[in-house]
Amino acid sequence: VTLIGWGSTADVIQESIEQLAEAGIVANHLHFKWMVPFHADEAIDLLSSCKRTIIVENNYSGLFHRYLRSETGFTVDGHIRKYDGEPFKPHHIVNAVQEQLKGGEALSVPYEEIIV
C-alpha cells in the first residue's frame, strides 16, 4: 500500500510505515512538498505503478485529494482524515490502513478519540 501525504504528515506517515511493517504489511510513502508548480506527469508516473493508494490528510474535506485529482485525474483507493485540530499519531494511520485493507472504511479518527 502506498500512503500519500503532503505538508505536516511526512514524519507520522514514516513512523506508521515502520509499525505497519512490524504487523506484516508492506507500505511505502509518496510525499508531495510542492503544489505550485505541480508536476502532474511525474505524479501520474509514480501513482500509476502503485497497487493500492491511501491518502492521509489533516483536514475534513480531502483538500489535497481533490487537488491531486484535478491536476492528474487520479483517484486514490482510500482516505484517512483527521480534523479535530490535533496531529495524527502513528496508531491512527496504522489502524485505519488495517481497516481499509480488510475492506472497511476509515475516513477519520473515531469520534470517541476526539473527546478527551
Residue ranges with predicted function:
Residues 34-37, 42, 91, 114-116:
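An N-terminal assembly and electron-transfer interface module characteristic of large anaerobic redox
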Residues 29-31, 78-79:
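A structural preference for short, hydrophobic beta-strand core positions in alpha/beta folds
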Residues 56-116:
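Peripheral docking tails and interdomain loops at the edges
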Residues 8-9, 35, 60, 85:
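Glycine-/small-residue-rich active-site loops that bind phosphorylated ligands and cofactors
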Residues 1-30, 36-42, 105:
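Redox- and metal-dependent alpha/beta enzyme cores, enriched for Fe-S-associated oxidoreductases
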Residues 50-51:
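Short, well-ordered alpha-helix to beta-strand connector turns
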